[in-house]
Curated annotation (Swiss-Prot):
<comment type="pathway">
    <text>Glycan biosynthesis; glycogen biosynthesis.</text>
</comment>
<dbReference type="GO" id="GO:0004553">
    <property type="term" value="F:hydrolase activity, hydrolyzing O-glycosyl compounds"/>
</dbReference>
<keyword id="KW-0119">Carbohydrate metabolism</keyword>
<dbReference type="InterPro" id="IPR013780">
    <property type="entry name" value="Glyco_hydro_b"/>
</dbReference>
<comment type="subunit">
    <text>Monomer.</text>
</comment>
<dbReference type="Pfam" id="PF02806">
    <property type="entry name" value="Alpha-amylase_C"/>
</dbReference>
<dbReference type="InterPro" id="IPR004193">
    <property type="entry name" value="Glyco_hydro_13_N"/>
</dbReference>
<dbReference type="GO" id="GO:0005829">
    <property type="term" value="C:cytosol"/>
</dbReference>
<keyword id="KW-0808">Transferase</keyword>
<comment type="similarity">
    <text>Belongs to the glycosyl hydrolase 13 family. GlgB subfamily.</text>
</comment>
<feature type="active site" description="Proton donor">
    <location>
        <position position="421"/>
    </location>
</feature>
<dbReference type="GO" id="GO:0005978">
    <property type="term" value="P:glycogen biosynthetic process"/>
</dbReference>
<dbReference type="GO" id="GO:0043169">
    <property type="term" value="F:cation binding"/>
</dbReference>
<dbReference type="InterPro" id="IPR006407">
    <property type="entry name" value="GlgB"/>
</dbReference>
<dbReference type="Pfam" id="PF00128">
    <property type="entry name" value="Alpha-amylase"/>
</dbReference>
<dbReference type="GO" id="GO:0003844">
    <property type="term" value="F:1,4-alpha-glucan branching enzyme activity"/>
</dbReference>
<comment type="function">
    <text>Catalyzes the formation of the alpha-1,6-glucosidic linkages in glycogen by scission of a 1,4-alpha-linked oligosaccharide from growing alpha-1,4-glucan chains and the subsequent attachment of the oligosaccharide to the alpha-1,6 position.</text>
</comment>
Length: 695
């Protein structure tokens, strides 16, 4: 019997039989006592005289099933976090923690932590054949123990200390050790929500997303972060008051650098400790669900940071990243790109996605920087990229990974949404994989967003020359399932807030902003608005401080907030505005050619749901500060057309120029319709009308 312990003065069996120290070493060895069987316990006396009795980790057999290792090697273990990482469990009748890590190019791997003085000599792990996976069961280790892995590369001999890629909780930055997290036993209260989620037809329901950075939405009085539970209550109250259907969180996956906003992830299986423990985040999601609000998480499989204690060069070789820097480095961001062609890396990422959807009941993932994954020459100079096997610039491995990701997540978690932030014209992003598409649920409409904000930034007197920027988007509006995003990226890095991107004096800026929102909420596509935009914050977003909530003391900002609430209500209540966001039959131009007056008008139509159609909604938008009196608009139905919303209402901070609540249609054919109404179009405003029985 041989024991190695560099910190022990003496080692003995529990019955008192001593193991003599081998001279000049830290080995203790001797014959086994008669009748001793595993698992046995050893009494170790340290150099300061303290004694500790525990089971010998090396008396236990392997704890990882061969089948898990087989699936992992084939790239088909979509729940790899269930066997890799640190897992408290009972093994051979003894409680403890099973550690496992993938490091195929290491000649030695050890578990180090606060339980062994961070000494890699104490708990070396065993390798499981050719899988590259190392494991060790440490009996008696308590929950909450801090740990990392110490690895020695077989070729260079370099010794590295790395945090656990599969850690489910980490220390608060700047510390980076993983924490032994017990199995989740949170008592969820969202059974009804989860059951409905599986049955939801997301294509035809209203989806209005409030994008939030938890660290800067609100803060405590001393400027510190609020915790998940406090944020849950405050955010839900605000979202219910403003009418959004979903909250989208900028990444809360663990990350070391606050300034990355979470987009440089090091912990793909752990909610950041900045705001609390994993159960606190479960409470956050649970509280949202119990109040009818979905939760979407920004998730970053495109790249990861170079921090030397995390994924980069994990076992002394480029393991998670591609070895060729022309494929493995992102020049602009200074980060590393995942090797999507490696089975174990694909397992890692797919398991992460499923983990958030299953373990934390997340309703959807917004996949960041998809364009950078699809193109081998993305943001690269000539000669700084390697073509694929066909000589093209498409990243075939990334395409295959994204298709597999969407196929698996949609199959295992029906009703969840996987959205792509994809800024190019790559075809079929949201078409099924069996048709050759990438399989995403939805895609951000970056083209519409860019054209719209460019147009809105023009002085109204010049807008007639840029009218095509309003109408061009309809040429491709139904080629994908689009989300219309005014996101965090549009209110930072010198771009200014949405309010200050609008031209004119104070009144015109607010009127333009209200007009912009009316356009967004009546145009085909699901909606997304970044925090602060809902009340017209004037300053650019600052991730290091809370939003400027004090501006809600001023009437014009109050008016914007009321408008967003009413737009959300209108979007939810009028089926024509949401049932066919992705179907060309749900939209028709009334007039898209009124360039001289910089006005557009269109119908949103409900083609019928369960065999019964609901009334259409007509939107008229005046992009000039000139009121338009006696403006005749063609409509498809007779009767009374009620003014459902007017952004120039004094309720929102406008001049209250409008149509007295509604107008009667006349039997005057106009614009291809058999009836028409005569309207007053307020300046820099949008009006929404729909037919009904009468005033």
């Amino acid at each position: 019997m041989r024991v190695y312990d560099p910190h022990a003065e003496a080692v003995a069996f529990e019955d008192g039989t001593k193991l003599p120290r081998r001279p000049g070493s830290d080995f203790f060895e001797g014959p086994l006592p008669a009748g001793l069987s595993a698992p046995y316990r050893l009494r170790r006396t340290s150099q300061d005289g303290a004694a500790h009795t525990a089971h010998d980790p090396y008396a236990f057999g392997p704890a990882l099933p061969d089948y898990d290792l087989h699936l992992f090697g084939e790239g088909r273990h979509y729940h790899a976090q269930r066997f890799l990482g640190a897992h408290p469990l009972e093994h051979e009748g003894v409680p403890g923690v099973r550690f496992a890590v993938w490091a195929p190019n290491a000649e030695r791997v050890s578990v180090v932590g606060d339980f062994n003085r961070w000494d890699g000599r104490c708990h070396p792990m065993r390798v499981r054949g050719g899988s590259g996976v190392w494991e060790l069961f440490i009996p008696g280790l308590p929950d909450g123990s801090l740990y990392k892995f110490e690895l020695r590369n077989r070729d260079s001999g370099a010794v590295l200390v790395k945090t656990d890629p599969y850690g489910r909780r980490y220390q608060l930055r700047p510390d980076s050790a993983a924490v032994v997290e017990p199995p989740a036993d949170y008592a969820w209260n969202d059974r009804e929500w989860m059951a409905a989620r599986r049955e939801d037809q997301w294509q035809s329901i209203p989806i209005s997303i409030y994008e939030v950075h938890l660290g800067s939405w609100q803060r405590a009085g001393d400027g510190s972060f609020l915790d998940y539970r406090t944020l849950a209550h405050r955010l839900v109250d605000h979202v219910l008051a403003t009418g959004f259907t979903h909250i989208e969180l900028l990444p809360i996956t663990e990350h070391p650098f606050d300034g990355s906003w979470g987009y440089q992830t090091t912990g793909y299986f752990a909610p950041t400790t900045r705001f609390g423990a994993p159960d606190d985040f479960r409470y956050f999601v649970d509280h949202c669900h119990r109040h009818g609000i979905g939760v979407i998480l920004d998730w970053v499989p495109a790249h990861f940071p170079r921090d030397d204690w995390a994924l980069a060069n994990f076992d002394g070789t480029p393991l998670y990243e591609h070895a060729d820097p022309r494929r493995g480095e992102h020049r602009d961001w200074g980060t590393l790109i995942f090797n999507f062609g490696r089975n174990e890396v694909r397992n890692f990422l797919t398991a992460s996605a499923l983990y958030w959807l299953e373990e934390f009941h997340i309703d959807g993932l917004r996949v960041d920087a998809v364009a950078s994954m699809l193109y081998l020459d993305y943001s690269r100079d000539e000669g700084d990229w390697v073509p694929n096997i066909h000589g093209g610039n498409e990243n075939l491995e990334a395409i295959d990974f994204l298709q597999e990701l969407n196929r698996i997540t949609h199959g295992e978690q029906p009703g969840t949404m996987i959205m792509a932030e994809e800024s190019t014209s790559w075809p079929q992003v949201t078409r099924p994989t069996w048709l050759g598409g990438l399989g995403f649920t939805m895609k951000w409409n970056m083209g519409w967003m860019h054209d719209t904000l460019t147009y809105m930034g023009e002085d109204p007197i010049h807008r007639r020359y840029h009218h095509d920027q309003l109408t061009f988007g309809m040429l491709y509006a139904f080629t994908e399932n689009f989300v219309l995003p005014f996101s965090h990226d549009e209110v930072v890095h010198g771009k200014r807030s949405l309010l200050w991107r609008m031209p004119g004096d104070e009144w015109q800026r607010f009127a333009n902003l209200r007009l912009l929102y009316a356009y967004q909420f009546t145009y085909p596509g699901k909606k997304l608005l970044f925090m602060g935009c809902e009340f017209g914050q004037g300053n650019e977003w600052n991730a290091e401080a809370a939003l400027d909530w004090y501006v809600l003391d001023y009437p014009l900002h109050q008016g914007v907030l009321r408008l967003v609430g009413d737009l959300n209500a209108l979007y939810r209540e009028v089926p024509a505005l949401h049932r066919h966001d992705f179907d060309e039959h749900g939209f028709a131009w009334i007039d898209c050619h009124d360039t001289e007056q910089s006005a557009i008008s269109y119908l949103r139509r409900d083609g019928g749901h369960d065999g019964e159609a609901t009334p259409p909604a007509a939107t008229v938008l005046n992009f000039t500060p000139v009121p338009r009196h006696d403006y005749r608009l063609g409509v498809p139905a007779p009767g009374y057309w009620r003014e459902r919303l007017n952004t120039d209402s004094t309720h929102y901070g406008g001049t209250n120029l409008g149509n007295g609540g509604g107008v009667w249609a006349e039997a005057v054919p106009w614009m291809g319709h058999p009836w028409s109404v005569v309207l007053t179009l307020p300046p820099l405003a949008g009006v929404v009308l729909s037919p009904e029985a009468g005033p």
